[in-house]
């Protein structure tokens, strides 16, 4: 498979495997000189070139373009040649050099007092600036040369000419005008949109994927196509790269949405849904996204799932085969080309197919003919191919987009996976069966191999923007009472719409998720999935833990007497047996540490009870708002975010809920040094006080950095503890090496009194807030009744 990022895969002169299209184009050009060759139907209607079919020099082409304007600035003949010259001159010389040639001609004409020719040159430049202002926006050297030319004209006293080539109109252009027009988002509040993948209809999903595709396709300019033809890759071509990355992202998203379901029946339901989405994309004539979806469904990581395929109906499989046949690369995509040419109005082509056509045409035809004349027919053919794609950008799609769903899909498509990771997850779902008979060879999968070398790697700023937009949309649709929280059940449904799972959610309030917590969740998950990549190759081994241990995947407790869970020998991750195949954290190999050292969960130390916000609290154990999250690979500065206390609900032997709160503890930036490692503080509030932020117990933890890549605070050196007076006193007595004296007991008594006072104050505050909320609720109910009575 070739890629756009590898120039070596491009066809070269003298190669024996020139694409069929290139040979056909040669026959079209030379059909007049070879009457015995059967004519091939031209791909586009071309204007008669006349004497230009034999080529022309660069100076002759410039002269013809200047003469295309009359003294009033109107265009006469050679108007299409003018378009070709301005858009395709990059194949011949840089834009700055073309402007310098025009400047030289202007100076010579002004010296010869040929004012009419000077006026035509100014009309030519004005047309260039007006119609192709994007070139000046993108090329700083061209803009500078234009300003110097303008100063030259003004210094000669030609005010009329100076006004014609005024560069102010370049800066007055709204750069985002073309990028935001023509697609009108649906701002109607009558229809409530669902952000849940399982609730989305195939038509709705296809329309919003088309919205994203057209938005990326519309941004590709003449210069972008031209740069790709010359370089053969998308390096330093961001608009082209974003379009290709979107195509690859959709293909990967389809695969991982299927693989994210645990059972064959559920995977078959998702697969069936995407086949119906493909049908709707075909009806919308969005062939590029159709290629991405079918390419994902036909990928070997999906096609090998025999148990899943067994639950797909015959009719659905028939539709998939029809779509695969439509997009087959056989006979140079003959089926697709036939259907595409029959389509009218709005349509989005398979960009890779047409880019291959452009490269084939560029390689098959020489740049110069005899006597070093420019091959004008080649420029004309390339212009027609590119112009057809550009004209499609002016046709608005027949749809209305809901921006909330657009934001959710945009974040979902920010993926970065490798082929090995796809196969690893596929084999985790359905392991290889060595006894199964060999599979009958089938049709080659539909994969956009031309774009496989481009990996969508959004930068952290883009990820943050996508996350914030998505979170705003979630709370707009699900936080109906506008209290800043959504339920745990709603969050789990929303999270299921993404092709990645993540750790247990942080909770400030039991059963409710705040805006800050859901933002932190998706920031961490998106950063791992879209930037760092994932490695599923953990070396898990069944392990017996001698001390209490938590699962690094679900944050649950590893219960049992022996062989409670699994431990990765490479990175030290701990997890349940049922979580072993669901781990999405990358395996980071660490320095060699003994099992005994890693298994020890807590170092002996002194237990201190420090009231929240009291004088005894030091900056070694700050609140959660002060503790920054540490990203792998040192990306903490980029992804700095405000994180809450991490609460885990455990069940004790007496069916009593125990709240274990974990929070990172980091020295203040002003006092932090490189030699002082981070530490963690385990806060174990009393079961009776688990719902109020009162007194917490701070357990000093070993500063050993966690080898586990989990972004949640490590629990390798911490354990849950049932907090009651007897256990606390007993632990303190053991740590102090003897029975507590009278002074220690008095201090503890005073400390408990201070804690009791703090809790009473917090209880009163909570009661006042409850009364306030009740009053607001009564007022809201009364207002609603009055409104209903009046209506």
Curated annotation (Swiss-Prot):
Disordered as annotated region, ranges: 683-715
Binding residues annotated for Ca(2+) 1, in chain numbering: 479, 481, 483, 485, 490
Domain N-terminal Ras-GEF: from-to ranges: 49-172
Coiled coil: 728-785
Disulfide bond sites: none
Location of the protein in the cell: Cytoplasm, Cytosol; Cell membrane; Golgi apparatus membrane; Endoplasmic reticulum membrane
Biased composition (Pro residues): 702-712
Zinc finger (Phorbol-ester/DAG-type): 537-587
Annotated keywords: Calcium, Cell membrane, Coiled coil, Cytoplasm, Differentiation, Endoplasmic reticulum, Golgi apparatus, Guanine-nucleotide releasing factor, Membrane, Metal-binding, Repeat, Zinc, Zinc-finger
GO biological process: cell differentiation; small GTPase-mediated signal transduction
GO molecular function: calcium ion binding; guanyl-nucleotide exchange factor activity; zinc ion binding
GO annotation, cellular component aspect: cytosol; endoplasmic reticulum membrane; Golgi membrane; plasma membrane
Domain Ras-GEF as annotated: residue spans: 201-432
Regions of compositional bias (Polar residues) in chain numbering: 683-695
Endoplasmic reticulum found in the keyword field: yes
Primary location recorded for the protein, binned into one broad class: cytoplasm
Inhibition and activation profile: Regulated by F-actin polymerization and probably by calcium.
Classification via InterPro entries: C1-like_sf, DAG/PE-bd, EF-hand-dom_pair, EF_Hand_1_Ca_BS, EF_hand_dom, PE/DAG-bd, Ras-like_GEF, Ras-like_Gua-exchang_fac_N
SMART domains assigned: C1, EFh, RasGEF, RasGEFN
Lineage top rank: taxon: Eukaryota
Gene3D superfamilies reported in the protein's UniProt record: 3.30.60.20, 6.10.250.2730, EF-hand, Ras guanine-nucleotide exchange factors catalytic domain, Son of sevenless (SoS) protein Chain: S domain 1
Comment block on domains: The phorbol-ester/DAG-type zinc finger is the principal mediator of the targeting to membranes and is required for functional activation through DAG-binding.
Described function: Functions as a diacylglycerol (DAG)-regulated nucleotide exchange factor specifically activating Ras through the exchange of bound GDP for GTP.
Entry protein name: RAS guanyl-releasing protein 1
